[in-house]
């Protein structure tokens, strides 16, 4: 597994996202060791791309970083908090500052695009519906899907589903964004557009981003 960090041209601006520090991370499934002594650091406001082939453990690493898997050993620092050592309640609070775009988009097929984007806002805030609707339109506009609030996911192309998933990941104005195979299954031109969108999000919001890809 390899990784690299990309520096932004506007690095003189103060980043809003925290740094991520992973120290000697191990994840076992029974007797099988999936991750062995993984260590890396993502500076605040920077982007790291984690590269690995199928079965290399990169998706397990991502799930562990967002708290969906518990590490067998090691530390995961998000700013000044060791995410791996927090209680479930503390982890849930910190997770609200994260956005996650899953492979394939993971949109709920029975909900409209707007309802999908609004879901985190309904679950984690007490905002009025009118305010949520404004925020949904704003997020969709930012990813190039203005006017698609009432579309169903089945009506979208693969690239549009990815954009809608990014809008949902951005709904809570996260400090950290995680992407799992954001351009998987897309043709090169559409994939390049998704990559450009991720770079745009990073430049505009100066947040910390981790991308897993192959």
Language-model regions, residue ranges each:
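Conserved ABC ATPase "signature" region
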Residues: 81-82, 129-148, 199
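Short coil-to-helix segment of the ABC ATPase nucleotide-binding domain corresponding to the Q-loop/switch region
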Residues: 111-119
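Conserved ABC ATPase signature
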Residues: 152-156, 160
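Conserved catalytic motifs of ABC-family nucleotide-binding domains
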Residues: 173
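Catalytic Walker B motif of ABC-type/P-loop ATPase nucleotide-binding domains
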Residues: 177-180
């Amino acid at each position: 597994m390899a990784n690299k960090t990309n520096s932004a041209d506007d690095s003189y601006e103060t980043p809003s996202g925290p740094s991520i520090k992973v120290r000697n991370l191990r994840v076992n499934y029974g007797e099988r060791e999936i991750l062995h002594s993984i260590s890396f650091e993502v500076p605040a406001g920077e982007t790291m791309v984690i590269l690995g082939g199928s079965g290399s453990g990169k998706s397990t690493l991502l799930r562990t970083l967002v708290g969906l898997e518990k590490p067998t050993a090691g530390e995961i620092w998000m700013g000044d908090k060791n995410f791996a050592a927090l209680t479930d309640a503390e982890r849930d609070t910190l997770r609200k500052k994260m956005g996650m775009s899953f492979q394939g988009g993971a949109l709920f097929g029975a909900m409209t695009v707007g309802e999908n984007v609004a879901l985190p806002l309904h679950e984690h805030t007490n905002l009025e519906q009118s305010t949520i609707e404004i925020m949904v339109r704003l997020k969709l506009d930012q990813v190039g899907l203005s006017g698609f609030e009432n579309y169903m996911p089945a009506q979208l192309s693969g690239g549009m589903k990815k954009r809608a998933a990014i809008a949902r990941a951005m709904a809570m104005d996260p400090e950290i964004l995680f992407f799992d195979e954001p351009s998987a299954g897309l043709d090169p031109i559409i994939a390049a557009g998704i990559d450009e969108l991720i770079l745009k999000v990073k430049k505009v919001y100066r947040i910390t981003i981790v991308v897993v890809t192959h």
